[in-house]
C-alpha cells in the first residue's frame, strides 16, 4: 500500500513474519513483528502521516513515528481495512458471531459505528453481508456486499445531512448480473483489492462480463462517484492477452489506475490505465525503465499503490539474481519497488530488504519435482522461502 502523498509504502516482509512501513524520502524502514509464528500480519491502508491499519492477530494500527503497533479487541473481533488520507477515520468490520461476513463499520477514534446494509428487496438479490474497504477525508466509504454467488458487487456509503448517520448506495445494482439467466451485461465485484481515490471521486473495480456461451471475460472499471458513470477496459482489448484477467489495485485523484494483467495466481504483468487513454503495461508506458520488463519476466509484477497526484507508484515483484545466497541453492527473491514517474533518469528503486527476507531456498515444478538451482520450467513454479513458506510463480 502507498500513502496518498507518496511518502510512505507499507506491506509484509517476505521471508519473515512481520509488517513494515518505509519512508521513501528519508529512506527509513520500521518493522512490526508478529507475536508468534502463527499470527498473520497485514497492512491494508496507510495515511499521509505514516499511520497504517490492518491486523497483527487482532485489528491493529501501525504508527511509523512511534514505531509501535497497537491492537484492538480480540482476534477476529474487529477488522481494519482502510484509513482516510488524514488518518482520522478507519473502516472495516466487527464480528459478533451473528454474521459470517461481519458488520461493516466506521471507526472514529476507536469507536465503531455500524454502517447500514441495503435490503434484499432493494438489491434484487439475497445479501450475505457487506464489508467496508476504503474511506475519504469527507467520509465517503467504498466496499461491497456479498451475494448468493459469492461475488462482491460494489457498494458506497455516504454521510447523511446530520453528519452522523450513513446511507448505503449499491451503485453496481444497474450492472450486476445476479445469475447466469440475468440480462445484465456485467457482474461488478470488488474483491479485497478495491479502493477509492483519496479525494473520493473514483473507485477502481474488477469486472467480469458474462458471455453468451456461458463463459466470461475479465476487465477493470473506473467508477465516478460524482456523475455515477462507469468506464471499462476488458482483457479482450489487449492484443495477445485476450484470455488474461485484469485486476486494478489502486486509483489516483485523476482516475489513473494501476494493477496487473494475467492472473492473481499465474504470470502477472504490471499495467497503468490513465483516464482518457488506452491501458498500457508499465514496460510500454515507461520504455526507458528496463526494470519493469525484468519484473514482468519474474511473473509476479504487481503495482498495488499510487499517490493521490498520480506521480508515485509502488508494487512488488519477484526478481532473479545471478548468484545464490550462501544458505540457498536458488537465486532471486521478492522485492518491493517504488517509482517516481517524473524522475529524470526514469529509473525504479527498491525498498531495502530485511535480513533474510524474500530468500528462496528451493524451486519445484508444478508436479512437485525439485528443479536444479537456477533452472525454470514454463508454467507454475513453486518456491520454498527461507522461513518455510511457499509461493507460486509463473514462467512464460
Residue spans for each PLM region:
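Conserved "turn/edge" positions that cap or connect secondary-structure elements
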Residues: 1-344
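C-terminal outer-membrane/trafficking sorting elements
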Residues: 347-396
Amino acid at each position: 500500500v502507498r500513502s496518498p502523498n507518496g511518502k510512505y509504502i507499507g506491506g509484509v516482509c517476505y521471508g519473515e513474519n512481520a509488517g513494515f512501513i518505509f519512508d521513501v524520502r528519508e529512506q527509513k524502514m520500521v518493522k512490526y513483528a508478529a507475536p508468534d509464528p502463527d499470527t498473520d500480519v497485514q497492512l491494508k491502508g496507510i495515511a499521509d502521516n505514516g499511520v497504517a491499519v490492518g491486523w497483527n492477530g487482532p485489528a491493529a494500527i501501525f504508527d511509523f513515528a512511534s514505531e509501535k503497533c497497537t491492537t484492538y479487541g480480540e482476534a477476529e473481533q474487529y477488522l481494519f481495512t482502510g484509513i482516510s488520507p488524514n488518518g482520522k477515520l478507519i473502516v472495516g468490520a466487527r464480528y459478533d458471531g451473528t454474521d459470517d461476513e461481519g458488520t461493516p463499520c466506521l471507526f472514529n477514534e476507536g469507536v465503531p459505528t455500524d454502517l447500514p446494509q441495503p435490503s434484499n428487496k432493494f438489491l434484487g438479490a439475497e445479501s450475505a453481508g457487506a464489508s467496508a474497504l476504503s474511506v475519504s477525508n469527507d467520509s465517503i466509504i467504498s466496499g461491497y456486499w456479498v451475494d448468493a454467488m459469492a461475488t462482491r458487487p460494489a457498494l458506497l456509503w455516504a454521510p447523511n445531512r446530520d453528519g452522523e448517520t450513513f446511507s448505503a448506495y449499491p451503485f453496481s445494482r444497474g450492472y450486476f448480473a445476479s445469475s447466469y439467466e440475468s440480462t445484465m451485461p456485467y457482474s461488478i465485484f470488488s474483491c479485497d483489492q478495491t479502493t477509492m481515490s483519496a479525494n473520493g471521486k473514483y473507485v477502481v473495480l474488477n469486472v467480469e462480463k458474462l458471455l453468451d456461451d456461458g463463459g466470461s471475460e475479465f476487465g477493470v472499471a473506473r467508477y465516478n462517484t460524482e456523475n455515477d458513470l462507469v468506464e471499462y477496459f476488458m482483457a479482450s482489448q489487449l492484443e495477445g492477452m485476450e484470455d488474461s484477467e485484469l485486476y486494478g489495485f489502486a486509483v489516483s485523484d485523476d482516475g489513473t489506475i494501476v494493477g496487473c494483467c494475467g492472473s492473481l495466481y499465474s504470470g502477472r504483468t504490471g499495467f497503468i490505465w490513465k483516464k482518457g487513454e488506452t491501458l498500457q503495461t508499465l514496460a510500454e508506458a515507461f520504455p526507458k525503465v528496463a526494470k519493469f520488463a525484468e519484473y514482468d519476466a519474474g511473473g509476479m509484477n504487481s503495482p498495488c499503490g499510487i499517490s493521490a497526484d498520480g506521480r508515485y507508484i509502488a508494487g512488488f515483484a519477484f526478481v532473479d539474481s545471478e548468484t545464490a545466497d550462501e544458505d540457498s541453492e536458488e537465486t532471486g527473491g521478492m522485492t518491493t519497488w517504488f517509482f517516481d514517474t517524473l524522475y529524470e533518469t526514469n529509473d525504479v528503486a527498491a525498498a531495502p530488504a530485511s535480513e533474510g527476507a524474500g530468500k528462496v531456498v528451493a524451486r519445484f515444478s508444478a508436479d512437485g519435482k525439485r528443479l536444479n538451482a537456477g533452472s525454470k520450467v514454463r508454467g507454475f513454479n513453486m518456491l520454498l522461502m527461507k522461513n518455510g513458506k511457499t509461493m507460486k510463480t509463473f514462467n512464460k
